């Protein structure tokens, strides 16, 4: 049966995902940055209270995936912490300035991760040649690749996702970006073994007093009075589609 991974940005989101049938969680912070490494407090509390597999993201900042030596050293320290806390896997990705997988750094990541399953995240979608990148990641021992098929969303990139799947059994190709209940069946019919979804909604902040003339963000247009939350009904609906597909 296809596996459903849900992207979560808090303990509350992780609990909702687990209760509604998620098979695995990608744990992140900073949704507006596309996901950054969670704090120690979030990592420890999720590790203590969530029973399904959780894979934290290792990403020190937003933007591109070419990191300074200092940033990369911090990534290795975060991997050490995630391993010490007992997580079964992690999510990360590093590129060269030319858009290739940085194999030298990936070797260091794989050594630091040890027995943990490593997912190469959507840095893959920024690679110059996805098919060469997949071969290199297979050689590195990466467990899976999260990809939208190098398009804005996975529905647009499905043909490339299918080509990547046809390239071999490993790494597992996990489709993500815009995967929802209304298009999930297309991915299952295409033979996608794992899907990744945020299943999220933005909820208004409970703050009654709001200083509308001030922002804590460099983006003055940012909405600081909304909060991301995993929608349990959306997770349950997707899990139901997967179960029914398996029963066919």
UniProtKB/Swiss-Prot annotation:
Coiled coil: none
Keywords: Cytoplasm
Gene Ontology cellular component annotations, sorted alphabetically: cytoplasm
Any one GO MF annotation of this record: copper ion binding
Subcellular location: Cytoplasm
Primary localization class, coarse: cytoplasm
Family: Belongs to the CutC family.
Subunit structure: Homodimer.
Name this protein carries in UniProt: PF03932 family protein CutC
């Amino acid at each position: 049966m296809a596996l459903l991974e849900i992207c979560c940005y808090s303990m509350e989101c992780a609990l909702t995902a687990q209760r509604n049938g998620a098979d695995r969680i990608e744990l992140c912070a900073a949704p507006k940055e596309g996901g950054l490494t969670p704090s120690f407090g979030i990592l420890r509390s999720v590790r203590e209270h969530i029973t399904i597999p959780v894979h934290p993201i290792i990403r020190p900042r937003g933007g591109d995936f070419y990191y300074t030596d200092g940033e990369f050293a911090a990534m290795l320290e975060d991997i050490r912490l995630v391993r010490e806390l007992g997580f079964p896997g992690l999510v990360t990705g590093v590129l060269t300035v030319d858009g290739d997988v940085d194999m030298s750094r990936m070797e260091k990541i794989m050594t630091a991760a040890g027995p943990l399953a490593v997912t190469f995240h959507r840095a893959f979608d920024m690679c110059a040649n996805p098919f060469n990148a997949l071969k290199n990641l297979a050689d590195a021992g990466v467990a899976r690749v999260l990809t939208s098929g190098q398009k804005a969303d996975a529905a647009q990139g499905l043909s490339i996702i299918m080509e990547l799947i046809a390239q071999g059994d490993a790494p597992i190709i996990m489709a993500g970006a815009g995967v929802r209940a209304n298009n999930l069946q297309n991915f299952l019919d295409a033979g996608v073994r794992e899907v990744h979804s945020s299943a999220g909604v933005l909820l208004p902040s409970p703050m009654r007093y709001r200083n509308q003339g001030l922002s804590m963000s460099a983006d003055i247009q940012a909405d600081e009075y909304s909060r991301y939350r995993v929608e349990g009904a959306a997770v349950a609906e997707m899990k139901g589609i997967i179960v029914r597909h398996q029963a066919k």
